[in-house]
Amino acid sequence: MGKGEGYLDPTILSVASGSRNSGKGKERTRRKGGHKYHSLHVQDEEEEEPPESDALRTRGKVGLNAYEKALWKWVNVDDLDGFLQEVYDYYKGKGIYCIVLARVLNLLTTFFVIAFSTFLISCIDYSKLFSSISTAEAVGRLEDVLVAQCITKFVHFKLYILNKTNSSAYDYRGSFAHTLFLIILSAFFIFQVASFAMSVPRLLDMYRFYTHLLGVPDADIQTLPWPEIVRLIGDIRKHNPVTSLSNGQATALADMVGNDAKAPAKKLDAHDIANRILRQENYLIALFNKDLLDLRVRIPVPHVLTAFIPSSILISSADAPLPSLQSEPERKFLSFGANHLTKALEWNLRFCLLGYLFDRRGQVRKEFVREKRRKDLVQGLRRRFIFMGILNAIFAPFIILYLLIYSFFRYFEWKFREFNELPHLFERRLDRSYEIAKEYVDQFPKERTALVMRFVAFIAGSFAAVLLVASLIDPDLFLHFEITPHRTVLFYLGVFGSILAISRGMVPQENMVFDPEASLNEVVRWTHYLPVEWRGQLHSQMVHQEFSKLFALKIMIFFSELLSVILTPFILFFSLPPCAAAIIDFFREFTVHVDGVGYVCSFAVFDFARYGNVDANQPETGLEGATGPDGGPAADGFAAGKPSRPTTRRTTSSSPSRLKHRDWRGNENKMEQSFLHFKATHPDWQPSDPSSSLFLDRLMGAGTRNRHGGGPVSAATGGISGSIYGGGGGGVGGRGLGVDGSVMAEMEEERLRAKRQSYERAWAKSSHLHRPDSSHSHPLRHPHSAASEIIEEEEGGEGDKGDDSIDGWSKRVKTDGETDDEEERERLWKDEGVIIIFFLTNNHITVVVMNVCRCIFRVAADEHKTAGRINKSQTRRLT
């Protein structure tokens, strides 16, 4: 049996049989734009899904080889989202050996922290170590300061804590805080060991999947790009499509709409895989892009104290950053901080939002797409925020401890991250921008600081040089000569050397070229972040200060993370609950259902007709021109809602005010940028939405015009053409992912060549659409050749007259001395027919081709009339 054949595929019952929801809701189907849409009813919250049969999962695998085990695992996947997440985690971890090694070293690191901290606190007598006695009997060896049997005393003290036995005989030196620290760290260590032991079977399954099904050995995972893994997964899905019923989506659809839902399994492409892996992260990216989260510290202030607090740090309900907060009664808040996401706050948001929106299988809970549950959901989210605020206030010391042990990061990066962008691609993009960003921050003129630091460096260097020369002359001065009491030459050499290094580091290099605009343009090329207020001001101090907040010093990040643990309870208790209504509305209004994938964030679908700007030269606007699925014409005249894959969007007509004032487009062209970056990352992926293809074609056309002197599009318009993707005319110089960029240049040139060939084939085939008869010549030939052709046909005899068949037409064309190129066009016409004109390319350029064909038909009709007149005159002449 060949590889990839699913002989172990279990027998799958008809997806339309056994409907569980018969009689619940109407079965409605409609067709729009050539696609079938299904109006699905929402399962009530009280309805529990029936437990799935464990027969397949408990099916024995005795006697199967490694490949058969991998194939058995694939065809028995019941949670495709979770499986693909494990596939990606395995790829990101660089294979089973790297993953196991990293986890074992993490366990050893935790164990070392426990053992070393116990040794430092319990096993050293610091009174002897820091003794001021400077006699011959002074401390000189480690064993002189060690506490005898310190580990034994520590263990007996723990037994005393547990059993309440007498511990007077044991001199335990550890404090209660250290004891608590060790208990928590030990529990964390045990949890890590248990998690690692439970993950070993899944790692082995992933190893077999990569090695035997995908054909990727463990050594090649570190060098193989992710798009190649996606392509291999698509090939496996093509041969073994059983997991198309993943997460119960297809079964539920079939039960609701009947046999019409039966369709061949859809392929699993890069877009579907990214939507499944990043189903939850895409919502967070959209929330930050739409600025729906108020992460500033807001503390209510009593009215009697407002007169004693500066007005600059007070905020009223009317000044609230969110529309939902402006409806509250007049109230003053003490507000400070900015909308920055720290690690501790991100943990809480994931629990409060994602844990509330998604079920245990990672699917969107269906009550979030219904308007009638809105009030209950808003109240539930508010209670969730308040509860987590109280919980964070209680456990703040332990959260700080975990941050110190674990790690801490900057999380303003959610503003940089794009839809359907996997974490390793995002990290690679930021890593490429780091050196250039550092160069941009450092090169800004600091003349006054440089003058002072040059003076400090001169003074410190002079002292350090004198001490160094003296030490070289007499080495005994280095260790025994005390400049101040108990401070030798060695100490002051270290002090002056440090001052010299710091001061010289703050002086810019003399040969450095000052060009902040070029540096920031290069940074934007990778970060894809260029706010409108920055454009035209890249050289200003304002942009420099704003940018410096994004690339802060590590020590500042460290203190901000620790401070956020204290401030997070206030944000959760006072700032986020008023945002609950806007968040619930966002989840409902920006959630769509894609057949075969499930509910996803609408921006991640790349539906330009609903949520994007199809015109690459169109300036980005706010509410003007931004339309929703139910709110008027879509961008560039496209009818709202014509994706090639069936989608169902849930909105309600009972909230027209909210829908009317909702900005349906992403801020700062986030969806357009995400689409282009995803296309550049996966060149083989073809967008299924016609509006996406049209956007890409227009962007390429704009870049082509700019390269040929058509004039660049001004960056001030705010459109994509003026951005890093526009190619030529933006504030970023047309680099990056644009048609002039290094990433997409070859891909776009190939697309242009393919499109030119498609137009040539269309022209060739369209020239034969009008069938020639006894009075009709080839529409593209010269009139004189047409006249001679008619004479030959008239003299050809009765047998050839009136032969309107394709074969007869082909014979006449061949006997007229056609060239080889014309014979090839005749063969294409005969084999493929007229209908192929409307399916020329994979880029949905049918509208353009139809317009070209319409013009050709008119030319053919005119020449037909001319040929008819010539035929009559020639007939009279022959008579």
Swiss-Prot record:
Residues 27-39 have a biased composition (Basic residues). Forms a homotrimer with a solvated central pore, which is connected laterally to the cytosol through the cavity within each protomer. Acts as a lipid scramblase that uses its central pore to function: the central pore opens laterally to accommodate lipid headgroups, thereby enabling lipid flipping and redistribution of lipids added to the outer leaflet of ATG9-containing vesicles, thereby enabling growth into autophagosomes. Homotrimer; forms a homotrimer with a central pore that forms a path between the two membrane leaflets. It comes from the Eukaryota. Residues 798-817 have a biased composition (Basic and acidic residues). Phosphorylated by ATG1. ATG1 phosphorylation is required for preautophagosome elongation. Belongs to the ATG9 family. Residues 632-657 have a biased composition (Low complexity). GO terms for biological process: autophagy of mitochondrion; lipid transport; piecemeal microautophagy of the nucleus; protein localization to phagophore assembly site; reticulophagy. The lineage of its organism: Eukaryota, Fungi, Dikarya, Basidiomycota, Agaricomycotina. GO terms for cellular component: autophagosome; cytoplasmic vesicle membrane; endoplasmic reticulum membrane; Golgi membrane; phagophore assembly site membrane. This is Autophagy-related protein 9.
